Amino acid sequence: MAPQLLLCLILTFLWSLSEAESNVFLKSKVANRFLQRTKRANSLFEEFKAGNIERECIEERCSKEEAREAFEDNEKTETFWNVYVDGDQCSSNPCHYGGTCKDGIGSYTCTCLAGYEGKNCQYVLYQSCRVDNGNCWHFCKPVQNEIQCSCAESYLLGDDGYSCVAGGDFSCGRNIKARNKREASLPDFQTDFSDDYDAIDENNFVETPTNFSGLVPTVQSQNATLLKKSDNPSPDIRVVNGTDCKLGECPWQALLINDQGDGFCGGTILSPIYVLTAAHCINQTKYIRVVVGEIDISRKKTGRLLSVDKIYVHQKFVPSTYDYDIALIQMKTPIQFSENVVPACLPTADFANQVLMKQDFGIVSGFGRTRERGQTSNTLKVVTLPYVDRHTCMLSSNFPITQNMFCAGYNTLPQDACQGDSGGPHITAYRDTHFITGIISWGEGCAQTGKYGAYTKVSRFILWIKRIMRLKLPSTESSTGRL
């Protein structure tokens, strides 16, 4: 009996093992439904499958061409690839003031909203001197990431840090129209004296009375042959078809007169001591005196006659070409300022080049001839003339236009400076302040079609002027009497 019981137990154990195996192992057909292995690339039809960015570039390293096949869009490919290669440069949000960042390989690009600029859109446009002069009324200078405004001499910088208001009754560049506007009292300011141009030799001046016969200009060609007089640029240039300048509207105008009492050149009042004029005016007479405040030389009611102490002619003046055509006249006694006698403001070089000379028009005035070969004018004339771009200027002229010159005038409209106006002011107004920008120098005739007036470019000589003007400060002596 015992052997039979043992046999039954063994058979029962073997049956239970077979049942367990059938529960663990599936038939191959069933098992393959669950245990299929995904194949990668190199299959027969792999290249015919649509691109998949995960299959192409996430599971394995891919090329840009493979990424393009997956996206089938160049812009999406570029966006993906820039991040894929070296990470997202825009993750730190580098663009300020709402700028939009676009990632690149090793770099990024910010697209700024209106009113901002810079690599990271970090600059507000009004904080750039290149845009509307930084909103400064006079001079603008970049300081780190901001701008600093300053004002011309005798002006005060406003509490807003931008505006400039006259600090006295007769501040420079204020004619009667500007003075009629409301003014305010503002805190002190600092003027920028950082310009760096030609140096001045302190001993380089001509005292009056002097015989100027040694300065008679000769115009020569490259082979040293004397040109005909009719081929010369006209040195006594230059206001045709202008209007009368009313009392107080051109208060910086000066008139140079000879020993016969005749006016022959103009000038611009810069300070109580100094008048700016053209170098070529100095060789035209033995004696020079200066009249200021006059608008009608036939009536002689408003002007003052001044004696000259010294004359500084630029040491590089070239009589044959009128290059460096600039001189400063020093008065023996200070000019007394009034509503009719006010200096023009002296700009900084940057302000003149980047702001003033990019205005549409300048203002020219003088007592010169009202037409070519006509009589000189008894009344002060003024005309508004457009700036002419340098390329057009050079093409129009038969004579050299150097870096120290610029052109102004109309191509066809008969308005111009003319003979007798030489040395006079070319003024540019900016925010109701008038700055000296040029000296009437020369031209080919007066108001001729296709010809423009040539002017000495004052911005090239700012430091030269300032250094001379520092040689002598105004004294307390009174000016000479009326005409």
Swiss-Prot record:
Disulfide bonds listed in the record: C57-C62, C90-C101, C95-C110, C112-C121, C129-C140, C136-C149, C151-C164, C172-C345, C245-C250, C265-C281, C393-C407, C418-C446
A GO cellular component entry from the record: extracellular space
Broad EC category: hydrolase
Propeptide residue span(s): 21-40, 183-238
Peptidase S1 domain: residues covered: 239-470
Substrates-to-products reaction catalysed: Selective cleavage of Arg-|-Thr and then Arg-|-Ile bonds in prothrombin to form thrombin
Residues with (3R)-3-hydroxyaspartate modification: D103
Subcellular location: Secreted
Source organism superkingdom: Eukaryota
Residues annotated as the enzyme's active site: H280, D325, S422
GO biological process, one term: venom-mediated blood coagulation
Keywords for this protein: Calcium, Cleavage on pair of basic residues, Disulfide bond, EGF-like domain, Gamma-carboxyglutamic acid, Glycoprotein, Hemostasis, Hydrolase, Hydroxylation, Protease, Prothrombin activator, Repeat, Secreted, Serine protease, Signal, Toxin, Zymogen
Signal peptide location: 1-20
Location of the EGF-like domain: 86-122, 125-165
Free-text activity regulation comment from the record: Inhibited by SERPINA5.
Residues covered by the Gla domain: 41-86
Cited InterPro entries: Coagulation_fac-like_Gla_dom (IPR017857), EGF-like_Ca-bd_dom (IPR001881), EGF-like_dom (IPR000742), EGF-type_Asp/Asn_hydroxyl_site (IPR000152), EGF_Ca-bd_CS (IPR018097), GLA-like_dom_SF (IPR035972), GLA_domain (IPR000294), Pept_S1A_FX (IPR012224)
PANTHER family hit by this protein: COAGULATION FACTOR, COAGULATION FACTOR X
Complex formation: The two chains are formed from a single-chain precursor by the excision of two Arg residues and are held together by 1 or more disulfide bonds. Forms a heterodimer with SERPINA5.
Protein name, as recorded: Coagulation factor X
Native source species: Tropidechis carinatus
Taxonomic lineage: Eukaryota, Metazoa, Chordata, Craniata, Vertebrata
